[in-house]
């Protein structure tokens, strides 16, 4: 079990039944906001995929995927998704979406190697979204514009929740602060990446840390990223300061996706050249898929943040270590 944060004197502001009502309101409101702001159309999404397609998310490349075999397909092995990062781009190409339009899904995933704590669960639920762009829009400026659109939707959600549930009032900044991972390392060279995130997010309350995945001048990465969906020069994480837990709290990871050149370069840098033979990777390398931008926005993360919950298990049902359940109960945190 990872380190558990137990806020002193914690008491949930909403009881379980009211929490469930609030969760529905948050999800209904935000998905409409984000669909309108980014011009997205809702689509159904897979729970599992064929590993031979290369469509599953490899995350940091070391996490084991949940898999099983299908009796009626000669025991063919399939994998439960870890995210839909690559699947969404494939769908945009398959259905010939035009620049400026895209999709969002309710993504449900299982990550069996997740280290469980207040904000990490084996079960992951998020709005996974993807939008077609032009080659000319593969710029930092376009990335920032998209981050601002998402942040405005989050700000509108904050105002909505404050009206609906004043007992869990949240005040977030009018604007999000942008900084690159290298600028952050230059500011705090003696600190580890997570410590840097803590300081910058505590100061600015809402931050987009960009350019994640490649090596910094120190020779270390800010954080790991799979080499086959985000362009490491055009991606980042949206972080909010969570004052219930006293931590930098990630609500979204997103980026402009790799073109053929970035895919080629990053596969080699990551030592993943074996993926070049997978269907998805061949399509990107051969310029057969549209340019796109996309990401994931945590559903339970947003609910947890705006309802001022101390544990993600207060807003979704999962399996937790017995000692975690017991310790949470003793400190006023009731896991569903």
Where are the regions that the model predicts?
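A general structural signal for short secondary-structure junctions and capping/turn motifs
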Residues: 68-71, 93-99, 119-121, 169, ...
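N-terminal pre-domains immediately preceding structured catalytic cores
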Residues: 50-57, 168-179, 321
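A generic secondary-structure signal for well-formed alpha-helical elements
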Residues: 34-41, 150-161, 310
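Extracellular structured ligand-interaction cores
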Residues: 101-103, 124-128, 204-206, 246-248
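Class II aminoacyl-tRNA synthetase-like tRNA-binding/catalytic domains
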Residues: 2-120, 128-132
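Extended, charged alpha-beta segments that form solvent-exposed binding/catalytic grooves
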Residues: 105-191
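A translation/RNA-centric and nucleic-acid-associated enzymatic feature enriched
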Residues: 110, 180-336
């Amino acid at each position: 079990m990872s380190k558990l944060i137990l806020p002193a004197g914690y008491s949930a502001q909403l009881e379980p039944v009211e929490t469930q009502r609030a969760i529905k309101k948050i999800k209904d409101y935000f998905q409409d906001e984000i669909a309108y702001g980014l011009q997205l159309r809702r689509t159904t999404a897979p729970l599992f995929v064929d590993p031979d397609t290369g469509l599953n998310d490899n995350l940091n490349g070391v996490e084991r995927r949940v898999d099983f075999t299908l009796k009626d397909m000669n025991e063919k092995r399939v994998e439960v998704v870890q995210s839909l990062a690559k699947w969404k781009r494939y769908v945009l190409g398959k259905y010939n979406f035009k620049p400026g339009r895209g999709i969002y899904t309710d993504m449900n995933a299982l990550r069996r190697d997740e280290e469980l704590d207040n904000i990490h669960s084996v079960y992951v639920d998020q709005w996974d979204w993807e939008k077609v762009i032009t080659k000319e829009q593969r710029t930092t400026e376009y990335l920032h514009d998209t981050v601002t659109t998402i942040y405005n939707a989050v700000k509108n959600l904050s105002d909505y929740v404050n009206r609906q549930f004043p007992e869990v009032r949240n005040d977030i900044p009018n604007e999000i602060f942008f900084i690159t991972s290298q600028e952050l390392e230059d500011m705090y060279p003696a600190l580890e990446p997570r410590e840097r995130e803590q300081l910058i997010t505590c100061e600015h309350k809402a931050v987009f840390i960009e350019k994640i995945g490649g090596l910094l001048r120190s020779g270390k990465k800010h954080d790991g990223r799979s080499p086959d969906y985000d362009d490491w020069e055009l991606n980042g994480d949206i972080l909010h300061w969570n004052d219930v837990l006293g931590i930098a709290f990630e609500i979204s990871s997103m980026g402009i996706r790799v073109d053929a050149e970035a895919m080629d370069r990053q596969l080699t840098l990551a030592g993943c050249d074996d993926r070049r033979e997978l269907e998805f990777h061949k399509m990107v390398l051969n310029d057969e898929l549209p340019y796109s931008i996309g990401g994931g926005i945590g559903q339970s993360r947003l609910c947890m943040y705006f309802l001022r919950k101390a544990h993600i298990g207060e807003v979704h049902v999962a399996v937790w270590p017995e000692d975690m359940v017991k310790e949470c109960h003793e400190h006023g945190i009731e896991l569903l």
